[in-house]
Amino acid sequence: MNKLENTIDSDIAGPAPRHRTTQVKVGDVAVGGGAPIVVQSMTNTDTADIDGTIAQVAALARAGSEMVRITVDREEAAAAVPHIRDGLAKRGITTPLIGDFHYIGHKLLAAYPACAEALAKYRINPGNVGFKDKRDTQFADIIEIANKNSKPVRIGANWGSLDQELLTKLMDENAASANPRDVRAVTREAMVQSALLSAARAEELGMPKDRIILSAKVSAVQDLIAVYQDLASRSDYAIHLGLTEAGMGSKGIVASSAALGILLQQGIGDTIRISLTPEPGGDRTREVQVGQELLQTMGFRTFVPLVAACPGCGRTTSTTFQELARSIQDFIRDEMPAWKTKYPGVEELNVAVMGCIVNGPGESKHANIGISLPGTGEAPAAPVFVDGKKFRTLRGPTISDDFKALVIDYIDQRYGQGAKVPVTAAE
């Protein structure tokens, strides 16, 4: 397997080649096997609340989530799943639903066949699918139902609910070794073995490799990196990346981006989920936006036009450029669901909103369309650049509205029918 230092080339900047994995179809979404890296999310509603869950899945799907996981933890939740699927279909939403099962998944799937049929994938936790002599039987029951319905599974080991029998066995072997390993290293090995042994058992039960996805989630960044490097080096199953319990706000974003960014750069990962703890009253769709932004800033995919803006300094005492950057970014995200169809390729657009003369003109020239707002002590004029050339200069109190109108006009003429960028003499 390629190490990070082997991905650096003095002439060619970019990630390592993607780790070869077996492609899995989850509904109509391809995962692995060279397919684009998929962004997924999870609801935090009570799944038995049909209307509430439909509303949140719809919001996540509109935000760009390509698969959505829902908790199926009791009979009321299992009974609700087909109604949720039907309700989404009535809204024109076909985003695959993934059932998250713990402890009693085998019972729920058997007792509610309509739930088993409505879900696009089942998530199994090998650490709590069953205990002692019941583990193998209950795991086999879920695989049998998955096979019957031709559904893929994600076998997801988790640091917080690791198979204790396997962990104890490995700890005992390590204690008896002449060269014992660090306890965390043994725990990481247990994570990898738990996922791989369960996948091998699923194949023995008739589950084809192209219906198996693996994950091994921990909450510590360095452990996560090591676990997934090991998992990728020992298998070619499709891989789901995620940092469990990443945390709230900037801490969660930084932790997930640090861990997943390194793994993605090394070619590891076929689908990602950013597990953010929402702020009180916060928007659940934030995790989707962060996942998209991570993949887009690393150059793996494009989802929405990028808005580049300077961080501000003593030259930019005015907040005008900050307000304009936020206004443009919010406007673009709000319009993207409609623009995806109306303006094919618009996600490739780059917009620059800069705050002064130092870097403003240069950065604006590198964007498809950019504006350099006046800094402190500068003339109250804002040059606009289109595809590297000065297009016109905006002045007065309506600079923000005028630039927004130019962006809309550029998008319409560049990506709409006719696809011709307006070029006029600079004013």
UniProtKB/Swiss-Prot annotation:
It catalyses: (2E)-4-hydroxy-3-methylbut-2-enyl diphosphate + oxidized [flavodoxin] + H2O + 2 H(+) = 2-C-methyl-D-erythritol 2,4-cyclic diphosphate + reduced [flavodoxin]. One of its GO terms (molecular function) is iron ion binding. [4Fe-4S] cluster binds at residues 310, 313, 356, 363. One of its GO terms (biological process) is isopentenyl diphosphate biosynthetic process, methylerythritol 4-phosphate pathway. Binds 1 [4Fe-4S] cluster. Keywords: 4Fe-4S, Iron, Iron-sulfur, Isoprene biosynthesis, Metal-binding, Oxidoreductase. Pfam families: GcpE (PF04551). Its cofactor is [4Fe-4S] cluster. Gene3D superfamilies: Dihydropteroate synthase-like, Sulfite Reductase Hemoprotein, domain 1. Its EC number is 1.17.7.3. Pathway: Isoprenoid biosynthesis; isopentenyl diphosphate biosynthesis via DXP pathway; isopentenyl diphosphate from 1-deoxy-D-xylulose 5-phosphate: step 5/6. Belongs to the IspG family. Converts 2C-methyl-D-erythritol 2,4-cyclodiphosphate (ME-2,4cPP) into 1-hydroxy-2-methyl-2-(E)-butenyl 4-diphosphate. This is 4-hydroxy-3-methylbut-2-en-1-yl diphosphate synthase (flavodoxin). It comes from Bradyrhizobium diazoefficiens (strain JCM 10833 / BCRC 13528 / IAM 13628 / NBRC 14792 / USDA 110).
